[in-house]
Amino acid sequence: MKYVAFLDVLGFKDKLGKMKQYEAAEFIGNFSTTAFRQWEIENISKLKGYIVSDSFVIYSDDTSCEALEEIVRVVTNICRKEFADNSILLRGAIAKGDFEKLEAKEISTLQKGLIVGQAYVDAYLLEGTVKSTGIVLSADVYEDLMNIGTYSDNLFEEIIEKKTHYVLRYLTLDFLLVEKNLSSFVELANEAKWLPHYYNTIYFSLKQEQNNKKVYQIFFNLFDLVCKGRPSENWRNIDLFIENAFQDNVIENFKTRFLKYIRQHICNANIQLDNREK
């Protein structure tokens, strides 16, 4: 039994279609270089992994608490580093079960990468079940992590369309409140025309946040970046941002929180207008 993580680049196929060959090669080169460098500086003792194109498979030696903590730490740090260095958003999943990477005889012109095991299949299938940039967890991995307690602040149980999902976030509210990080995030979202993944990522970053000032600030900053500080000139960007927030695949609780911000912003604007008239 092992823990297996499967990660890949959000929207890679769409990106590839817009790139020339040398741009795609540079993109993948930057992705793999950052992953390798982060791997080297981590204190890894119980993990192995390999990269194929835009995908990264990481697996543990066993299912000990140490192995689980290590794979979660490494996955989280790699995801954050890829975003910080390359503006690459990763999504993925972690599952638990049988897994084996088979050693096979190779020749110089034909290399083999043979893997087998239910844990890999589960992680691969889980990866796309939640439209977000977080890491989806199998139920047993979530339970193991909750028992350890180390990452409980970033673990969430979310019911989406009457089905329970377990998510590990790597983009926190404090991380996104850093101007450079949020600017990169909005740029990617604008390029993707604000797919549900981006709203749901914001939702998980806000989840369980008790500081209302921070919540208000992240929405305020988002609007400012979406319209590039010129709302009257770039109103179409704002319209798209608001309209797409209510797509079917955006988590309902995000829509509720977003509407609360809009109401609050309108009320504040009316109060300011009343004060001016007085």
Name these PLM-found stretches.
Residues 40-66, 82-116:
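Catalytic core of nucleotidyl cyclases, primarily class III adenylyl/guanylyl cyclases
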Residues 14, 100-103, 143-147:
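Short catalytic/ligand-binding loop motif for oxyanion handling, primarily in non-cytosolic enzymes
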Residues 1, 132-278:
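Intrinsically disordered, glycine/charged-rich C-terminal tails and inter-domain linkers
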